[in-house]
């Protein structure tokens, strides 16, 4: 959605590449750069929309799918000629059931895990989907240290390993000087042609870890190319930048919404054929 055509990874860590980044462009002793043939361009269009109130009710994985199919707008926007498509958005993500295999250092609780030793771990056993990205999603995370010292309770890591891909959740408690209230995490463990069978999670520090939700979700990618192709059907041409403005040309036979991948901030004004329009 942000129009990122290129990405880099450490050499030898290609399993961390997001789906679609397959063409190696260049490399040095440390990094390799890859290009995606499915990335969206600098600008693209939508011909349907979803009300933001409906969008906010979706799960995190549903939101990323919706954003590829419809434009999200506030309810009070006047959108003549566009389709309201909240009911027709296609969702293919699947929550995957799992069994917990814990070590002697981890006790499974109803809402989390009690870890008695630094580095204690659990293994989640499940049947992952083929041709999918696999996510670990945790919500409303909380950590209570076994010790009372401030430094022991300020931050903690969860180290996750799945199919040779390693990721880390760095969680800061409200005792951390850099605490910012983040308690929900989605960890993308990568795209795999064949579904994996287990995910190992190790807890850096002893203590009690609780969550309101702790789940595995697989996101099939078979419809991804079709969705991006629909967005690419139209967009700006002859784009020029000058000072704090940009211009471009677009021709469309029916009403569409144009998305330009410039991060939004207050102060922008848009004109279509010389007439000011809504942003």
Q: What is the predicted function of each stretch?
A:
Residues 96-279:
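Active-site-proximal, structured, solvent-exposed surfaces of multi-pass membrane proteins
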Residues 1-104, 112, 116, 123-127, ...:
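A cross-kingdom signal targeting lumenal/periplasmic-facing segments of multi-pass membrane
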């Amino acid at each position: 959605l942000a129009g990122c055509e290129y990405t880099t990874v450490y050499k030898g860590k290609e399993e961390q590449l997001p789906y679609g980044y397959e063409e190696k462009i260049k490399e040095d002793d440390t990094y390799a750069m890859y290009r995606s043939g499915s990335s969206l361009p600098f600008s693209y269009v939508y011909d349907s929309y979803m009300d933001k109130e409906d969008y906010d009710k979706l799960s995190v994985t549903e939101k990323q799918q919706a954003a590829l199919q419809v434009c999200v707008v506030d309810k009070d926007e006047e959108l003549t000629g566009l389709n309201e498509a909240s009911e027709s958005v296609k969702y293919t993500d699947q929550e995957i059931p799992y069994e917990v295999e814990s070590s002697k250092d981890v006790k499974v609780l109803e809402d989390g895990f009690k870890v008695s030793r630094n580095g204690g771990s659990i293994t989640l056993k499940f049947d992952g989907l083929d041709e999918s990205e696999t996510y670990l999603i945790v919500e409303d995370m909380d950590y209570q240290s076994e010790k009372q010292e401030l430094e022991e309770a300020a931050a903690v890591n969860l180290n996750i390993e799945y199919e040779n891909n390693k990721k880390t959740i760095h969680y800061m408690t409200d005792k951390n000087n850099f605490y910012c209230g983040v308690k929900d995490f989605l960890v993308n463990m990568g795209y795999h042609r064949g579904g994996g069978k287990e995910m190992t999670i190790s807890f850096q520090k002893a203590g009690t870890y609780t969550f309101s939700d702790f789940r595995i979700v697989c996101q099939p990618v078979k419809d991804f190319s079709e969705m991006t192709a629909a967005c690419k059907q139209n967009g700006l041409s002859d784009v020029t930048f000058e000072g704090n403005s940009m211009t471009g040309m677009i021709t469309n036979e029916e009403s569409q919404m144009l998305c330009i991948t410039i991060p939004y901030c207050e102060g922008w004004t848009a004109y279509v054929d010389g007439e000011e329009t809504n942003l």
